């Protein structure tokens, strides 16, 4: 895949589409998703 869209599970920022960051929805907790 070219990049992971918003809401996609991820392990690092570089897997996410341009402008998205790999972040948890709850601070410092897994799982992490491509979010703003």
UniProtKB/Swiss-Prot annotation:
This is U6-ctenitoxin-Pk1a. It comes from Phoneutria keyserlingi. GO terms for cellular component: extracellular region. Neurotoxin. Causes spastic paralysis and death in mice. Does not inhibit L-type calcium channels. Its main location: secreted. Pfam families: Toxin_12. It is found in: Secreted. InterPro entries: Huwentoxin-1. Signal peptide: none annotated. The presence of a 'disulfide through disulfide knot' structurally defines this protein as a knottin. Keywords: Disulfide bond, Knottin, Neurotoxin, Secreted, Toxin. One of its GO terms (molecular function) is ion channel inhibitor activity. Disulfide bonds join 3-17, 10-22, 16-34. Expressed by the venom gland. Belongs to the neurotoxin 10 (Hwtx-1) family. 53 (PNTx27C4) subfamily.
């Amino acid at each position: 895949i070219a990049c992971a869209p918003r809401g996609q599970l991820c392990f690092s920022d570089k897997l996410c589409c341009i402008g998205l960051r790999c972040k948890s929805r709850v601070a410092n907790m897994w799982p992490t998703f491509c979010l703003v």
